[in-house]
Amino acid sequence: MAHMVKCVKLGREAEGLEEPPFDSELGQKIYNNVSAEAWRGWTEHQKMLLNEYRLQPWKKEHQEFLVQQMEAYFFGEGSEAPKEFVPPSH
């Protein structure tokens, strides 16, 4: 049986992640409150942040920035794109 959550991002019941995304209190909070669909949305948003801000994920300060953005994306006011960002046209 799938792990179901009341997703904080989608505002509805949805299938959750198979396991916490990382071993921490935040990872457990995401596992309990974020759907797999919303997590996929975050990974796309994170890619945009990495590219637009030219982040280097092995640098501690860039990791901290991404964690702050993740918390805002799921549990705060939301994570915004840089002002210069132009979404790709499909």
UniProtKB/Swiss-Prot annotation:
It comes from the Bacteria. GO terms for cellular component: cytosol. It holds the Pfam family Iron_traffic. GO terms for biological process: cellular response to oxidative stress. Keywords: Iron. One of its GO terms (molecular function) is iron ion binding. Could be a mediator in iron transactions between iron acquisition and iron-requiring processes, such as synthesis and/or repair of Fe-S clusters in biosynthetic enzymes. Belongs to the Fe(2+)-trafficking protein family. This is Probable Fe(2+)-trafficking protein.
